Structure formats: C-alpha cells, structure tokens
C-alpha cells in the first residue's frame, strides 16, 4: 500500500474547503501513521503552467506547510486532473513496484480526487478513500458539502473505491 497525497498545495488548502480543520487533522494522522509503519507517502502536485502563479517555483504551488514531504518522499507533477495521466509517471512508478493498493487523500474532491480515483480503478488499483481526508470548495452547481457527500457516499463506494471511516483507514495502514 501507498498513501497518495494529491494537490495539497498552499494555493488551495484554506478555510474555503469543506470541514477544513477535520480535513487537515485527518491528513496529518494518515501521513504520520504511514510514516510510522514504513508505508510510502507519495505527493502529487498540480502545475497550471508558467506565469499562472500556480507552477513550479511559486509559493502557491508548494505543498501545504502541515503536510510537508520528507526529503526522501517522491513527488509527481501533473497538469491535468488525474494523477495517473502518463505525463506524471505515477502509474509507471506504481506498476514497477507492483503496488496495487492506493490510499488517497487531498483535494479537490470533485476534480482531481475524483479523476484519480476513477483512473486508478480503471488501471486495476484498489483505491481506498478515508472519510474526511478529501475536500473541495463550493462551485456553481453544488456546495462543498454536497460535493463531498455525493462522491464519498454515492459515486465512489461499491463502484470505484473502498470509502472507509478514518479509524479503519488507520488500521489498514498498520497492517
């Protein structure tokens, strides 16, 4: 198993996210438990391209201060919603390691987390989604709360991912 931390970057990790404090606390718990158990923590960062303010070298691009990677932890860069798009190299990396179980956390529930969950499933990976370890902001169609519940409680379970309570996620990291 690996823990995949998706797009938890300075420019978008803030109070606009649904259940912000719970989200931050849960990701910190997951990262801590994974490291304690020797489970690889992998970071994915979204790059909107040069001169956008959200690209390599920009403060907004950097991983959120409370989730900082260790020097030896892998980082993959993407420019589309799915972390498994060929350009990132993530799928090839996991395939080479023969890794099939991916616990995912990060943002945005309705964009990059959804795309990565569905793509991971399509590539034969077991995607595990801990409760309140992904989040999003309001959009013109749904509130952040509606979006969170739609994906975590309706779309993903029994289709694309194992959506598990936080205590179960922590147990899985200890196996």
Which residues make up each language-model segment?
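Active-site-adjacent betaalpha module
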Residues: 1-2, 29-32, 54-175
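N-terminal nucleotide-binding beta1-loop-alpha1 segment
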Residues: 4-7
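Catalytic metal-binding/acid-base residues of hydrolase active sites
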Residues: 9, 47-48, 81, 108
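Active-site loop signature of alpha/beta-hydrolase-fold enzymes
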Residues: 11, 49, 135-136
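Short, glycine/acidic-enriched capping/hinge loops at junctions between secondary-structure elements
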Residues: 15-17, 53-55
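A short alpha/beta connector and helix-capping loop motif
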Residues: 16-47
């Amino acid at each position: 198993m690996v823990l995949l931390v998706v797009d938890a970057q300075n420019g978008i990790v803030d109070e606009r996210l649904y259940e912000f404090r719970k989200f931050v606390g849960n990701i910190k718990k997951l990262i801590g438990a994974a490291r304690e158990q020797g489970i690889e923590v992998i970071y994915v960062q979204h790059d909107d391209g040069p001169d956008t303010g959200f690209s390599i070298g920009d403060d907004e691009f950097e991983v959120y201060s409370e989730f900082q990677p260790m020097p030896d932890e892998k980082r993959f860069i993407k420019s589309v919603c799915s972390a498994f798009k060929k350009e990132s190299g993530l799928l090839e990396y996991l395939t080479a390691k023969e890794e099939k179980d991916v616990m995912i956390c990060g943002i945005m529930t309705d964009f990059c987390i959804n795309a990565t969950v569905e793509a991971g499933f399509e590539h034969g990976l077991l995607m595990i989604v801990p409760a309140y370890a992904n989040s999003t902001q309001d959009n013109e169609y749904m509130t952040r709360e509606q979006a969170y519940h739609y994906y975590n409680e309706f779309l993903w379970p029994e289709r694309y991912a194992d959506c598990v309570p936080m205590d179960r996620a922590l147990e899985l990291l200890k196996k």
